[in-house]
C-alpha cells in the first residue's frame, strides 16, 4: 500500500481492473438472479451531486447482492426524449446569457465547446459521454454493454411495439382533455419540460355565472355550495378587464373577465371572441344577480384579487371565508363614493349556509376572533381559513336555505351541485393550475382543452385494479409509502401521451404525433435485456413486432419471429431465455419526486403488458439532495456536478458522504464541512488498515482467546447482523453506521483494552463489510492483505452472522468496564480532582436479582412495575430492604423500557459476577486512571467513608475518589 491515501490513483487503478476483467457484465447462469434498475438520467446537463444519492444507493444494493452470491444485473441508459433538449439547443443557438452562464460556470463546459452544442443531437452526444464517464469514475458496477439512448432507432422500434400493444388493448384513447400547455411551443408539457411548477396539478373549478345587464360576470370557485351565501363580488379596480363573446355547446354569451382570464379561455374548448376593453371601475358598485336564487349582490373593490386567478372576479362569502370577512371589514370605514357606493356596508346581511359542530352561525367571524386575526395581511388569516375549510369539509352539512341540497355533506356536494349548475346553464367547469407553471422556454403555461389528443386511459378502473394488486403484492420501501402509492392510483386521470414537438418516437398509429417523454420510459427495463444482443449486430429493420411478441410475451411462435425478423432462431431463443431468467425487475430504486409520475406509470404499463409473474417485485424510495441548503438545478444552478465532486473529493469519499447523510425518505444536504469529515474517515480507514498490514500481527489461535478477543468477535457479529439487516431493507445509512462508524468504535475499544491478536481477522471482515459502500479503497486493502490477480473483493463473500461467536459474558464484562471507566472519567472532569485512589462498589445481590427479573419479564413482554414489585416482595430477603425495593424496581422498569433494541438484546440474558469481572481487569483500571483502585461489593463494603455503596446499580458500580 502507498504511504499516503491517494484517492485518484487508487480509484483509477481499480476502475481499470474492473473494466478489463468485465466483472460487472452479467450473463444468465444457474445462480439466483437480482435485477436492479434506477431511473436513467435526463441528459440536458451533467450529472450532479443529487444524482449520487439514488445512483449510489442502487450501486450499494447491487454490490451487496453480488457479494451475497446473486447474479446481479445493474444496467444503465440515457433519457433524451421530449422538449428540454430541443429548448436547450435553441437557447445555445441564441446565445442566451443565462444559459451560457449556467452551463459554463456550473456544468464546467468550455465556452467554445458549448457554442458548438447547438443541435439536440450534439447535446445528446456530449452529455451521454460525460454521464458514462462520471458514473464509471464514481465506481458504479454497471453492465455498460446494455446502454442506449431513447432516440436510438432500435429503441424507437421497441416503443412503437409497446404503444401499438396499448392501442390494441384500448388503453390509448382519443378525445378532449385538459393538459398543461406551452403556448409558445404549441405543445403539451410534462414534468421534464417545466422550469417552475413541476408539482402543479390541474384543478377543476366551478364557474358560476352571475348576471348583469345582459352579460355574464363569471366567478371561479372550488366551493360551489357557498354560492348560496354570496353577499358581494370582489373586483380589482387596477386590473384590465375585457368583454368577450363566448360560444360553448351552441350557447352564445357575453362575458366580462380579466385580460389574463381571456388569454386562458382561448385555450379551452370554447370559442372566444374579443369585443372590447372594459374599465374595471365601471364594474364596481353595480348590482349583479346570483343565478341560483336571483338575489341582488353588490360588487366591491379589492386590490387582493389577481387577474390570473380564475376569471379575475371573485365571489365573497364572509360568513364562511375569513379572508372575505376581513376584506369586507376593512371597507367599513372607507369612502367608496368614487364607485357610486354610498350605502353602509355594515348593513350587508351575512348568510350562514353550513352547519358544523365546532362553530356557530358564522364560522369565519368566530375563527378570526379565535386566532386574533388583525387584518387580511396577518399570517394568522391563512391559519383561520384552513381550520374553517377543513372542519366544514369533513363535518359540515348544508342548511335549509340551500333548498333541495339541505342536509347534504359538504364533502359530497361539489360534483352534484356543479352538475346541476351546468344543466341549468348557470355554471361551467373551468380548469386551473394549483400553482403557476412555466415552461423551460420561459413561457407561462396554460390549461388547454386539447381536441383530438391521444391519452393513456389511466382512469380505466380495470387497469387500476391490476395496479392495486401489483402494489399489494410487491415490497414498497419504506413500507408507509404503500398508502401514498394507492392514493396516487386513486387520483390518476387520463394523461396526454403525445406531442407535436421535441425528440422522440412517432406514434405508430398516428404519425402526426410524437410519444411524450414519460410514456416511452415505463418498460425500458425489459429493453436492457434485448439491448445486449442488438449491440452484437441486429439491424433496426429486424426489430419487428413479432420478435418482441415472442421474446417478451410468448405471444408469437419462434418460427414466425425468426421468419419475420430474419434473425437466427438460436439467437432469438437466447434472447428469450435471457428475458425469462432476468425478468421481472427485483428492485426499482428511485427518488421520491417520481412517485406521482414515472413510478406510477412504470407500474401501470407493466401490469398492462406483462403477465403477473413479470410484474415488478419491489420499489425503494429515497429523498432529495440539496447543496448547502439550496435546491440544485441543472438549468438554473446552484450545482455541483458529479465530475467535480469526484475530482475535488474522490469517489469513495463522495459515496461515503452521501450514504451517511440521510436515510430513505429523509432529504440530504451536501455540505463542504460534511464531506471534509468523510475525507478524514476514509483516510483513517486507510491508515488503520496500512498499520495493521504493516505490523505483521500473526493469525490468532482461536483456542487461546482472551476475554477481550471473545468480546471483539461477539461485537463483530452484531455489526455484521445489523449491516445485513439494514441492507436487506435498503437502509443504507444505518448499514454504513454499523459497517464503519460503530465497528470502528468497537475496534478502538478493543485496542485500548490491549487486544491485537484478532486485528487481521477483523480487518478482513471489515473491508468486506465496507466494500459495497467504498469499493475502491476496499479493493486496495484486499489486495494488500494477499488477494491478487482477479481475486476481487467485489466478488468476495459478504460477511455473515455467526451466532456461535456471540459471547454475552464477554459483552457484559466490557459493558461493565467501559461504563465504569466512563463514569470515573466524568467525575474527574466535573470535580477537577486528581485521584490517588478510586474505590468501586458493585451492585448488591438484591438489586441484581431485581434487575434480572425485570429483564426476564421484558423479554417475555409482560414487564409491569406493579407485578414486578409484588413478585419481589414475596421474598423475605427482599422485604428486609423495605421501601428501597419498590423505589429501585420503578427505576429499573423505566431504564429497561428506555433501552434501545441492541442494548436490550445484549443484556436480555444478563448473568455476571461484577466483582470478579472488575478484579480481573484491575490493572487496566490502574493504568487508565493513574492511581490505586479497590473493589468491593456493596453487600460487604469494608471501606465506604461517604456511604457511596448505596448508589451501586447493575453494570454501574458506585464510585468514591480520594
Swiss-Prot record:
SUPFAM superfamilies: Anticodon-binding domain of a subclass of class I aminoacyl-tRNA synthetases (SSF47323), Nucleotidylyl transferase (SSF52374), ValRS/IleRS/LeuRS editing domain (SSF50677). It is an enzyme of class 6 (ligase). It comes from the Archaea. ATP binds at residue 634. Its EC number is 6.1.1.4. It catalyses: tRNA(Leu) + L-leucine + ATP = L-leucyl-tRNA(Leu) + AMP + diphosphate. PROSITE patterns: AA_TRNA_LIGASE_I. One of its GO terms (cellular component) is cytoplasm. Keywords: Aminoacyl-tRNA synthetase, ATP-binding, Cytoplasm, Ligase, Nucleotide-binding, Protein biosynthesis. A motif ('HIGH' region) lies at residues 41-51. It is found in: Cytoplasm. Its main location: cytoplasm. A motif ('KMSKS' region) lies at residues 631-635. GO terms for molecular function: aminoacyl-tRNA deacylase activity; ATP binding; leucine-tRNA ligase activity. One of its GO terms (biological process) is leucyl-tRNA aminoacylation. Belongs to the class-I aminoacyl-tRNA synthetase family. NCBIfam families: leuS_arch, PRK12300.1. HAMAP family: Leu_tRNA_synth_A. This is Leucine--tRNA ligase.
Amino acid at each position: 500500500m502507498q504511504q499516503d491515501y491517494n484517492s485518484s490513483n487508487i480509484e483509477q487503478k481499480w476502475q481499470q481492473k474492473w473494466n478489463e476483467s468485465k466483472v460487472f457484465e452479467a450473463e444468465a447462469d444457474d445462480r439466483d438472479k437480482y435485477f436492479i434498475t434506477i431511473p436513467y438520467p435526463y441528459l440536458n446537463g451533467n450529472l450532479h451531486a443529487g444524482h449520487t444519492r439514488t445512483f449510489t444507493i442502487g450501486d450499494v444494493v447491487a454490490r451487496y447482492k453480488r457479494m451475497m452470491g446473486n447474479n446481479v444485473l445493474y444496467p444503465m441508459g440515457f433519457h433524451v426524449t421530449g422538449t428540454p433538449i430541443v429548448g436547450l439547443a435553441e437557447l445555445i443557438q441564441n446565445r442566451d446569457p443565462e444559459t451560457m452562464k449556467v452551463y459554463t460556470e456550473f456544468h464546467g463546459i468550455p465556452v467554445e465547446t458549448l457554442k458548438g452544442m447547438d443541435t439536440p443531437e450534439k447535446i445528446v452526444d456530449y452529455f451521454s459521454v460525460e454521464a458514462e464517464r462520471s458514473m464509471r469514475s464514481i465506481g458504479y458496477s454497471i453492465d455498460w454493454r446494455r446502454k442506449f439512448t431513447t432516440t436510438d432507432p432500435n429503441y424507437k422500434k421497441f416503443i412503437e411495439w409497446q404503444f401499438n400493444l396499448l392501442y390494441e388493448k384500448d388503453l390509448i384513447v382519443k378525445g378532449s382533455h385538459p393538459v398543461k400547455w406551452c403556448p409558445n411551443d404549441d405543445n403539451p408539457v410534462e414534468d421534464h419540460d417545466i422550469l417552475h411548477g413541476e408539482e402543479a396539478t390541474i384543478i377543476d373549478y366551478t364557474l358560476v355565472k352571475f348576471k348583469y345587464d345582459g352579460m355574464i360576470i363569471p366567478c371561479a370557485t372550488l366551493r360551489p355550495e357557498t354560492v348560496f351565501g354570496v353577499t358581494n363580488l370582489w373586483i380589482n379596480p387596477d386590473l384590465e378587464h375585457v368583454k368577450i363573446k363566448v360560444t360553448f355547446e351552441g350557447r352564445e354569451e357575453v362575458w366580462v373577465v380579466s385580460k389574463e382570464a381571456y388569454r386562458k379561455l382561448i385555450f379551452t374548448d370554447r370559442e372566444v371572441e374579443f369585443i372590447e376593453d372594459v374599465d374595471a371601475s365601471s364594474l364596481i358598485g353595480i348590482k349583479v344577480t346570483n343565478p341560483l336564487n336571483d338575489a341582488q349582490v353588490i360588487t366591491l373593490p379589492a386590490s387582493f384579487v389577481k387577474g390570473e386567478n380564475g376569471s379575475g372576479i371573485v365571489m365573497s362569502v364572509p360568513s364562511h371565508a375569513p379572508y372575505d370577512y376581513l376584506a369586507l371589514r376593512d371597507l367599513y370605514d372607507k369612502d367608496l363614493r368614487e364607485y357610486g357606493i354610498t350605502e353602509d356596508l355594515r348593513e350587508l346581511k351575512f348568510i350562514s349556509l353550513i352547519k358544523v359542530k365546532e362553530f356557530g352561525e358564522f364560522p369565519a367571524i368566530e375563527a378570526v376572533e379565535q386566532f386574533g386575526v388583525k387584518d387580511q395581511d396577518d399570517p394568522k388569516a391563512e391559519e383561520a381559513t384552513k381550520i374553517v375549510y377543513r372542519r366544514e369539509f369533513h363535518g359540515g352539512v348544508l342548511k335549509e336555505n340551500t333548498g333541495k341540497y339541505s342536509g347534504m355533506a359538504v364533502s359530497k356536494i361539489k360534483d352534484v351541485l356543479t352538475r346541476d349548475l351546468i344543466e341549468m346553464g348557470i355554471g361551467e367547469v373551468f380548469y386551473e393550475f394549483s400553482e403557476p407553471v412555466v415552461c423551460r422556454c420561459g413561457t407561462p403555461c396554460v390549461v388547454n382543452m386539447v381536441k383530438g389528443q391521444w391519452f393513456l386511459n389511466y382512469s380505466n378502473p380495470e387497469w387500476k385494479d391490476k395496479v392495486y394488486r401489483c402494489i399489494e403484492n410487491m415490497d414498497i420501501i419504506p413500507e408507509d409509502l404503500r398508502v401514498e402509492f394507492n392514493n396516487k392510483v386513486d387520483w390518476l386521470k387520463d394523461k396526454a401521451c403525445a406531442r407535436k414537438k421535441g425528440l422522440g418516437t412517432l406514434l405508430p398509429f398516428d404519425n402526426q404525433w410524437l410519444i411524450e417523454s414519460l410514456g416511452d420510459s415505463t418498460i425500458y427495463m425489459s429493453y436492457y435485456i434485448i439491448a445486449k444482443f442488438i449491440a452484437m449486430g441486429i439491424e433496426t429493420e429486424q426489430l419487428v413486432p413479432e420478435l418482441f411478441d415472442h421474446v417478451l410475451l410468448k405471444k408469437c411462435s419462434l418460427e414466425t419471429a425468426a421468419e419475420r425478423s430474419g434473425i437466427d432462431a438460436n439467437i432469438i431463443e437466447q434472447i428469450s431465455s435471457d428475458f425469462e431468467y432476468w425478468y421481472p425487475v427485483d428492485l426499482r430504486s428511485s427518488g421520491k419526486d417520481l412517485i406521482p409520475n414515472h413510478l406510477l406509470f412504470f407500474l401501470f404499463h407493466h401490469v398492462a403488458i406483462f403477465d403477473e409473474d413479470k410484474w415488478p417485485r419491489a420499489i425503494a424510495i429515497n429523498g432529495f439532495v440539496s447543496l448547502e441548503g439550496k435546491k440544485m438545478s441543472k438549468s438554473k444552478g446552484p450545482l455541483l456536478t458529479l465530475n467535480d465532486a469526484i475530482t475535488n473529493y474522490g469517489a469513495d469519499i463522495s459515496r461515503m458522504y452521501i450514504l451517511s447523510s440521510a436515510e430513505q425518505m429523509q432529504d440530504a444536504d451536501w455540505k463542504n464541512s460534511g464531506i471534509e469529515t468523510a475525507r478524514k474517515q476514509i483516510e483513517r480507514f486507510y491508515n488503520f488498515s496500512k498499520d495493521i498490514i504493516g505490523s505483521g500481527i500473526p493469525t490468532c489461535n482461536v483456542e487461546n482467546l482472551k476475554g477481550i478477543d471473545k468480546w471483539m468477535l461477539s461485537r463483530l457479529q452484531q455489526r455484521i447482523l445489523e449491516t445485513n439487516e439494514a441492507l436487506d431493507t435498503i437502509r443504507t445509512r444505518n448499514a454504513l453506521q454499523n459497517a464503519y462508524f460503530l465497528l470502528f468504535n468497537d475496534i478502538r475499544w478493543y485496542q485500548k483494552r490491549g487486544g491485537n491478536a484478532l486485528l487481521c481477522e477483523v480487518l478482513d471482515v471489515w473491508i468486506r463489510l465496507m466494500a459495497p459502500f467504498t469499493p475502491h479503497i476496499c479493493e486496495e486493502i484486499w489486495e494488500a492483505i494477499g488477494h491478487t490477480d482477479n481475486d476481487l473483493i467485489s466478488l468476495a463473500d459478504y460477511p455473515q452472522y455467526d451466532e456461535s461467536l456471540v459471547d454475552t459474558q464477554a459483552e457484559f464484562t466490557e459493558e461493565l468496564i467501559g461504563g465504569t471507566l466512563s463514569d470515573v472519567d466524568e467525575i474527574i472532569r466535573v470535580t477537577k480532582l486528581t485521584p490517588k485512589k478510586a474505590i468501586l462498589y458493585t451492585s448488591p445481590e438484591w438489586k441484581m436479582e431485581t434487575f434480572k427479573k425485570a429483564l426476564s419479564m421484558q423479554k417475555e413482554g409482560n414487564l409491569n412495575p406493579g407485578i414486578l414489585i409484588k413478585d419481589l416482595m414475596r421474598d423475605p430477603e427482599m422485604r428486609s430492604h423495605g421501601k428501597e425495593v419498590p423505589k429501585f424496581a420503578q427505576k429499573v422498569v423505566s431504564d429497561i423500557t428506555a433501552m434501545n433494541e441492541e442494548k436490550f438484546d445484549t443484556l436480555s440474558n444478563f448473568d455476571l459476577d461484577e466483582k470478579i469481572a472488575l478484579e480481573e481487569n484491575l490493572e487496566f483500571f490502574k493504568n487508565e486512571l493513574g492511581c490505586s483502585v479497590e473493589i468491593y461489593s456493596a453487600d460487604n463494603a469494608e471501606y465506604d467513608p461517604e456511604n457511596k455503596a448505596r448508589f451501586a446499580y447493575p453494570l454501574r458500580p458506585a464510585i468514591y475518589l480520594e
